[in-house]
Every structure is written in C-alpha cells, then in structure tokens.
C-alpha cells in the first residue's frame, strides 16, 4: 500500500507519518494487516509535479492540508476548499479511485457558536466537494469533523492546551479568562489509532446533532469517538500538579485512557531541556542513604535505600504498614521475626537474582549488607506515604 499524506508537516501529519513509518519499518507490529510500502509526504514546500506523481501512485490518501489562521478570512476558502479541488482533480486525472480521508472540523456543522465561522464554511464546502467526488467516481471518502485537537503544536497559536502546557512548563505567565469554559478534546494518539482503523476498514461512523457527535453505523461522517470534555480550570489545575511533582514527588492519578494521562505526556513535551533532570532529597548518614522517589495517593511510595558494607538497617515492625524490599545491587540478608509467636525467617538476596521480599505487618525486620566492599542497593515500596503524625513504626531488634 502506498499512502499520500497532505499537510504532512503539521501537527497531525507529523504524528501520523511517524507512526505510519513505524508500521512500514516493522517497529509497530500491532497492525499486521497493514502492508505499507511508500509514504508520500506532501506539504507547502512540495511541488505540483510531486503532487501529480503521488496522486498517480497512491492507494490511500490522508488529506490533512488546510489553513486555520490566515491573514485574510477569504484565504480560508482558498486554503481549504481550493487545495481540496486541486487534489481531487489530480486523482481524477489519473483515474485513481484510492480511498481518501478528509480532515474537517466540528466548525463545519455551522451550529451554535460556529454559526458565523468562515473557517467552518470553508470546511463545509470542502466536505461537500468530497461527497460529490465520491458519487462521481465511486471512490470511498471518509470525512472526519474533528473537535479541538490535543498534541504537540506551536504555543500561542491555535491551541489553548498547548499554550497552557508551554507556559506552565516554562514558567511563563498565562491567563484563563473563564475557568468554567469547556473544551471537547481529541488526543493525537487516539486520532492516529483512528486512522489505522480507517486503513483497516474498521472506522466508526456518525451523524451530528448540532455540534454533538451521534454514533450511527450508516452515518455520513466518520469519527474517532475517544474524546474528553474538560474545563479550562481542570486543565490548568492538572498542569500545576504536574509542575509540582518533582518537588512533592506526588504522581497525580492517571488511569489508563484518562485525560490526565494524556495531558501529562503532552506537558512533558514542552519541558525545557534543563528540566529533564531534577534533584531528589537524599537522606544521608554514616550507614548510607535513603531517597524517596515517587509518591502516589493510592499506592504509597517508592524509595531507594543504600546500605554501606556491613551495615544493618531496619530493626522495626509495623501494625498495618507493609513493604516490599527488592535488592538490585549487592549481596544482603533480610531477616524477619513474628513479634507474637517468635517465628523467624531469613532470605539471602542479591542483585544477581532480583527477587521481591514482603515485610509483613507484625513481623520485625532488618536488612544486612553482607559485603565487605560493596554497597547494597534496595528498591523499597511501601503501601503508604510516611506520616510523621502516624508513623506506625516501632523499634524492635530481630
């Protein structure tokens, strides 16, 4: 399959081309049915001759080209409708009935606040041109009316989310005029997966009730139904949590598929390189060090413990707190004793064979570095964040 992507250097085009190449080059094996040979990338710096060649050879076309911030309103029609006409005429010239996808906009509904949108009118005209082309040629046409897109793009240009991410990550001032303003957002990775579905003939169809997407198996339009409705206030509050994470160590809740998970990934792409690395507080004494790495609201914390040669650490027990000790370097011994029955167990542990050992509530425990020359490095997970007002930790030698 040869694929033409117009607008290949835009936000969507860049992400789509990168991921199409992953499939073509065998780096992404999750879509075995897709056999991609060539990816033709067309953008503003391409030539008419290249477009002519690509339209002759393409088996599938993603038309992402268009304008959304022209200097003059009339340029909307020229940039969105005009290029669409050129593309379809070029395909007709070569009698190429390749499937073609059109990136349109929710503004093309011309409903609600979009009623007077010049951009929406130009997109609507492009849609009708594509539907007419499908009737005339019999080619499959897939028209997507995208909501606000969420991906790495130029800040202070066309995306409030990108602007907020950039501002928070770079300590720049920003203004939220109305925290209650709601956006419907489509994340770039979800969009790309939707395009893979289209390539495989598994796209979802819809109609529109005003600006609301209504799934319908025989709908005129196609859609990627995985969107998120969030307020500006919710977005900036999450971003402030992300910014504070290196200091608080608290990782915000980010369930699989959640908006927070996607926003955090996007936020990180705006970090300046001098923020890629940040210091952690090492609690150092003559025995070694103890450093907390990550806190979570639901699952406690993760830490790194370093014990110098011959050192014993621990010698305490907990009522309800529990831990996992995972030695990743060095050679050590973990001992535990039930404070009620006196039963004892011990485990020899080594970074050469990584194992996890439970520290059981009601069992006093320690960890001993058996080496005379090497540090013992242990990852320690705990089911709760340390609370000095309720430490649940009691000294008791094993």
Model-derived regions: residue spans:
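Double-stranded beta-helix
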Residues: 341-343, 368-398
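Short acidic-glycine-tyrosine-enriched beta hairpin
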Residues: 338-363
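Conserved Rossmann-fold NAD(P)-dependent oxidoreductase catalytic core, especially the SDR/UDP-sugar
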Residues: 85-124, 137, 142
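A short glycine-rich, His/Asp/Glu-containing loop-to-beta-strand
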Residues: 274-315
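Mid/C-terminal beta-alpha module of Rossmann-like enzyme folds, strongest
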Residues: 197, 201-282
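N-terminal Rossmann NAD(P)H-binding glycine-rich loop of SDR-like oxidoreductase domains
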Residues: 1-26
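NAD(P)H-binding glycine-rich loop region in Rossmannoid oxidoreductase-like domains
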Residues: 44-82, 86, 90-93, 107-114
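NAD(P)-dependent short-chain dehydrogenase/reductase
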Residues: 131-183, 188-202
């Amino acid at each position: 399959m040869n694929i033409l992507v117009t607008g290949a250097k835009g936000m969507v085009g860049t992400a789509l081309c990168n991921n199409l190449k992953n499939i073509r080059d065998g780096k992404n094996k999750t879509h075995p049915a897709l056999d991609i040979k060539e990816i033709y990338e067309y953008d503003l710096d391409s030539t008419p001759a290249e477009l002519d060649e690509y339209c002759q050879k393409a088996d599938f076309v993603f038309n992402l080209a268009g304008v959304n911030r022209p200097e003059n309103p009339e340029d909307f029609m020229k940039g969105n409708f005009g290029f669409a006409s050129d593309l379809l005429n070029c395909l007709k010239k070569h009698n190429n009935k390749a499937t073609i996808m059109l990136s349109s906009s929710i503004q093309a509904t011309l409903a609600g606040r979009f009623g007077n949108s010049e951009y929406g009118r130009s997109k609507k005209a492009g849609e009708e041109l594509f539907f007419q082309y499908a009737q005339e040629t019999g080619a499959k046409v897939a028209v997507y009316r995208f909501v606000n897109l969420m991906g790495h793009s130029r800040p202070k240009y066309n995306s409030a989310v990108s602007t907020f991410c950039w501002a928070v990550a770079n300590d720049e001032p920003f203004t939220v005029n109305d925290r209650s303003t709601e956006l419907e957002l489509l994340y770039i990775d979800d969009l790309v997966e939707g395009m893979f579905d289209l390539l495989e003939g598994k796209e979802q169809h819809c109609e529109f009730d005003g600006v609301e997407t209504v799934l319908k198996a025989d709908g005129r339009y196609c859609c990627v139904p995985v969107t998120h409705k969030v307020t500006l206030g919710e977005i900036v509050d999450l971003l402030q949590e992300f910014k504070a994470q290196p200091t608080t160590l608290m990782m915000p809740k980010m369930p699989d598929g959640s908006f927070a998970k996607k926003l955090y990934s996007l936020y990180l792409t705006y970090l300046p390189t001098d923020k890629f690395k940040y210091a952690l507080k090492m609690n150092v004494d003559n025995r070694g060090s103890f450093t907390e790495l990550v806190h979570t609201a639901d699952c406690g914390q993760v830490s790194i413990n370093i014990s110098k040669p011959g050192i014993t650490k621990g010698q305490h027990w907990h009522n309800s707190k529990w831990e996992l000790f995972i030695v990743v370097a060095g050679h050590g011994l973990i001992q535990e004793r039930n404070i009620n029955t006196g039963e004892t167990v011990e485990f020899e542990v080594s970074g050469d064979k990584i194992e996890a050992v439970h520290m059981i509530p009601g069992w006093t425990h320690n960890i001993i570095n058996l080496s005379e020359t090497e540090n013992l490095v242990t990852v320690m997970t705990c089911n709760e964040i340390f609370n000095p007002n309720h430490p649940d930790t009691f000294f008791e030698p094993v």
